[in-house]
UniProtKB/Swiss-Prot annotation:
Pfam families: ATE_C, ATE_N. GO terms for cellular component: cytoplasm. It comes from the Bacteria. Belongs to the R-transferase family. Bpt subfamily. This is Aspartate/glutamate leucyltransferase. One of its GO terms (molecular function) is arginyl-tRNA--protein transferase activity. It is found in: Cytoplasm. Functions in the N-end rule pathway of protein degradation where it conjugates Leu from its aminoacyl-tRNA to the N-termini of proteins containing an N-terminal aspartate or glutamate. It catalyses: N-terminal L-glutamyl-[protein] + L-leucyl-tRNA(Leu) = N-terminal L-leucyl-L-glutamyl-[protein] + tRNA(Leu) + H(+); N-terminal L-aspartyl-[protein] + L-leucyl-tRNA(Leu) = N-terminal L-leucyl-L-aspartyl-[protein] + tRNA(Leu) + H(+). Signal peptide: none annotated. Its EC number is 2.3.2.29. It comes from Stutzerimonas stutzeri (strain A1501). GO terms for biological process: ubiquitin-dependent protein catabolic process via the N-end rule pathway. It is an enzyme of class 2 (transferase).
Amino acid sequence: MTSLARLKFYATQPHACSYLPDEQATTLFLDPSQPMDVQVYAELSEMGFRRSGDHLYRPHCQRCSACIPARIPVNAPELSRQQKRILKRNADLQVRGVRPAFSEELYALYANYIEKRHADGDMYPPSREQFNTFLVRDLPFSRFYEFRLDGRLLAVAVTDVLPNGLSAVYTFYDPDEERRSLGRYAILWQMGEAARLGLKAVYLGYWIKNCRKMNYKTEYRPIELLVNQRWVTLS
């Protein structure tokens, strides 16, 4: 175990919340001068921290505790009929993990995804600079898992491989392949990959009960939420 007591953290000023209208958010960041050590990252992930670009962060709001860290234990998944159908529907895809690097093919998929799925969000409009800063970080534990059909790129799951699990950083995919449910499939695939690697969980980021865009996270069972500094199974 690493001593976390020596680490420094910084809180932002209140800013508009990306998920809940009319709410102000505060974010706690690990001191960016601290090297991105995989063991520190793993221990902080147990405390609800996430990675964005070169930064580790978690919500630190004074008046709101709606953002609840969520993870899926992978040793005994309880797949629904819909999830089994999604796995079967995508059995023809080939997956490979590569080190993060920019390519026009990747950016075109990302830009199309943002434009068609998140035109109302703070990541719109997409740009190459945004894509590189957010996702293309050459970190030894980070992978781009590419999902292809006969060579055609359909989805990318940006994933950090930690000692305690896989952290699902971001997934983008072809929005025209709606029937495949590629976002949900990427999580199911990550669950299988975590189990194959002998890891205990897939870390999904934050679940917000009153945010419709977050509802999909509780489709995966069992799922654990970090409540009062303890991981508890959602019943």
